[in-house]
């Protein structure tokens, strides 16, 4: 996806960034795991603010960052509270991650999507379904129990045009 396409999908504003640049790697939230071509999403947590690691992510090869504030000299897609509803303002980059995942699914309409929900047994069921999905073709499923508002979009963003089956796990 190009930066312009991503900006439209997440209602973001390009800063220090060419709109034609493409993400050729993954969407990453841990700056220590950034590789060349990745897109880094700066998430503010209770103890650590991902915005502190944006410059390091670029230095490691990220093509840009999704951030909620401008970081001088860092190619960024800025999502601000002004672009969000009142329920979304607390974590604009988390919301942007979800919007980007939703957008990707619209670009890949032929993927079989299986969602596992409930209060117990989800991970085992998800693992069994992932094994079955592999019989159909390339399958994306979360490793472990990444079933929250960050893990679910990250799983979706692992998909590409070769993916046949997407297994998702969500706790209610």
Which residues does each predicted region cover?
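N-terminal leader/targeting and accessory segments in enzymes
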Residues: 1-99
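Phosphate-binding loop of NTP-binding sites
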Residues: 89, 93-172
């Amino acid at each position: 996806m190009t930066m312009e396409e991503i900006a439209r999908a997440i209602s973001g504003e390009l800063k220090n960034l060419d709109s034609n640049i493409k993400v050729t790697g993954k969407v990453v939230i841990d700056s220590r795991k950034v590789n060349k071509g990745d897109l880094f999403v700066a998430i503010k947590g209770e103890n650590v603010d991902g915005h502190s690691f944006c410059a390091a992510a670029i230095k490691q090869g990220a093509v840009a960052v999704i951030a909620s504030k401008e970081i001088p000299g860092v190619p960024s897609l800025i999502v601000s509270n002004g672009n969000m509803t009142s329920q979304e303002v607390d974590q604009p980059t988390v919301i942007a991650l979800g919007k980007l995942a939703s957008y990707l699914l619209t670009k890949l309409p032929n993927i079989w999507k299986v969602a596992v929900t409930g209060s117990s047994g989800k991970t085992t069921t998800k693992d069994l379904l992932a094994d079955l999905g592999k019989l159909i073709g390339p399958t994306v499923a979360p490793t472990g129990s990444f079933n929250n508002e960050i893990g679910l979009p990250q799983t979706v963003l692992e998909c590409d045009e070769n993916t046949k089956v997407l297994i998702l796990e969500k706790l209610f």
